Curated annotation (Swiss-Prot):
GO terms for biological process: methanogenesis; methylation. Its EC number is 2.1.1.249. It comes from Methanosarcina acetivorans (strain ATCC 35395 / DSM 2834 / JCM 12185 / C2A). It is an enzyme of class 2 (transferase). This is Dimethylamine methyltransferase MtbB2. InterPro entries: Dimeth_MeTrfase_MtbB. Catalyzes the transfer of a methyl group from dimethylamine to the corrinoid cofactor of MtbC.
Length: 468
């Protein structure tokens, strides 16, 4: 009897497949992406490599040493303190504690602060509170800390917002009115996100993560791109990540354009250039998981789309890898075997520059991804590599080479805890455990500025406040 391997369906249910069936599913998934996106399918060698990763005997797998990449985040600390029947585990804790847990306990390379609703519009009435939280977090943390939220243009429609719901208008055949409603909502989305980030950047935020961009279709993408453009013009040094909501931009409007390109119907490799033109530093492409298909089918499909996006993008690509995207099952507690295999495949086959950790419980998401492919933050040199990706738009190899040269170590040493522990203490750039007298928070980041020849926004704020 042929050997069967334990794998998953897109909803997380365990299934058993033979090697021949795995390869058949991989080829079908890759072909689906190639057909839809009009892009190259995976080669035979790449299919073989994916099959090899899927059939590895261990429950958890990881990238080859030296191939580690930085991680960014969606949903911030909500996976710890949130409790809405979703992926939050309901631990009563402050957001400062949550952010520091990601930095000190999970080995995150970057982190983000976010409002419990995790959308920009609800932040407006409480922006002063968000600014306070950001400043306190920046005073205590070393890794890059973003403000993260969803553009979520749907909140601008009735009953939550001022503009009539375009879906209702379309049902009444009021097409022109529906278009105008979407255009007004997009303008307000741009205005609100820019205003909020003006406040947060003045409070020391390293930058912004636009998460789940285009969830409300092409109008959502349009408003976000214009927000990125405005922020880049006003704040040349702001770190900006744009993570998408889905693999294709839905044409809710259909006629909206950016830089002469119609937004409706764009696939990841076509979205990348527009995100770069708007002024982002990092692009977060997405491929949705089909819950009725197998994990090999979903993974090959995702890798095919993302590989092409990485190839054509001028920006570092941090693929979104939460539950229900990137070949990962749609389950609040994502299976560790599926998460680590998808993480490894995205790095080794798709060639991504980083992983954007998405929705899922702490063990199933940040811990699994960081164990599989992360650089482990201030345990090693992950925060330094991430800073160069965002400061100079460096792809992963260039960023690693730059940091290694500054530290006078081999690239392989950047994820070596033994090498970096001693070196970080010697350079006084922050260590993960408590060392009396060692630089922490702002002091450590000021030393990082000198080491990497970059400017860090929270340090600039400190100098402004102290007149130094």
């Amino acid at each position: 009897m042929a050997t069967e391997y334990a794998l998953r369906m897109g909803d997380g249910k365990r299934i058993f497949l033979t090697k021949e069936k795995i390869r058949e599913e991989l080829e079908a998934g890759a072909a689906n992406a190639a057909d839809l996106g009009e892009i190259p399918a995976l080669s035979g060698d790449e299919i073989d490599r994916l099959a090899e990763i899927l059939m590895m005997p261990g429950k958890a797998v990881s990238v080859e040493q030296g191939m580690e990449v930085p991680v960014t985040h969606d949903i911030g600390t909500i996976r710890l303190d949130g409790d809405q029947g979703n992926s939050g585990v309901g631990i009563p804790s402050s957001r400062l504690v949550g952010c520091m847990m990601h930095e000190r306990a999970f080995g995150a390379d970057t982190m983000e602060l976010g409002h419990i609703d995790y959308s920009f519009k609800p932040v407006k009435p409480v922006v002063s509170n968000e600014c306070q939280a950001m400043e306190v977090c920046q005073q205590n943390m070393i890794i890059p800390l973003f403000y993260g939220a969803m553009p979520n243009m749907g909140l601008y429609y009735t009953p939550d917002g001022p503009f009539e719901n375009p879906g209702d208008l379309m049902k009444a055949f009021k097409i022109q009115e529906a278009w105008e409603s979407m255009e007004h909502a997009a303008d307000h989305l741009t205005r609100d996100t820019v205003w909020i980030m003006q406040k947060l950047f003045a409070s020391g935020a390293d930058g912004v993560n636009f998460d789940t961009t285009a969830a409300a279709g092409d109008g959502d993408f349009y408003g976000t791109l214009h927000a990125v453009e405005a922020l880049r013009k006003e704040f040349p040094a702001m770190h900006i990540e744009v993570g998408m909501a889905g693999e294709m931009v839905l044409g809710m409007h259909g006629n909206l354009q950016y830089e002469g390109v119609t937004l409706a119907g764009l696939w990841p490799h076509q979205q990348a250039s527009l995100v770069a033109k708007a002024g982002a530093n990092v692009f977060g492409p997405v491929v949705n998981t089909n819950t009725s298909k197998t994990s090999p089918w979903n993974l090959a499909r995702a890798v095919t789309f993302i590989k092409e996006a990485v190839k054509v993008s001028s920006l570092p690509c941090h693929v979104d890898m939460g539950m229900g995207v990137g070949g990962i099952p749609m389950l609040e507690t994502p299976p560790i075997d599926a998460v680590t295999r998808a993480s490894k495949a995205m790095v080794e086959v798709a060639g991504v520059d980083g992983i954007o950790i998405g929705v899922g419980d702490p063990l199933g998401m940040p811990i699994s991804h960081i164990m599989a492919s992360g650089m482990t933050g201030i345990r090693a040199a992950g925060d330094l590599v991430a800073r160069m990706q965002f400061s100079k738009n460096m792809r992963i190899k260039e960023a690693k080479k730059y940091v290694a040269k500054k530290l006078d170590v081999d690239v392989m040493d950047l994820a070596d805890e033994h090498v970096m522990r001693e070196l970080r203490e010697e350079l006084d750039i922050g260590v993960i455990t408590s060392v009396p007298g060692a630089a922490k928070g702002i002091a450590a980041k000021m030393n990082i500025e000198k080491l990497l020849d970059v400017r860090i926004n929270s340090c600039e704020l400190f100098r402004k406040q102290t007149g130094r």
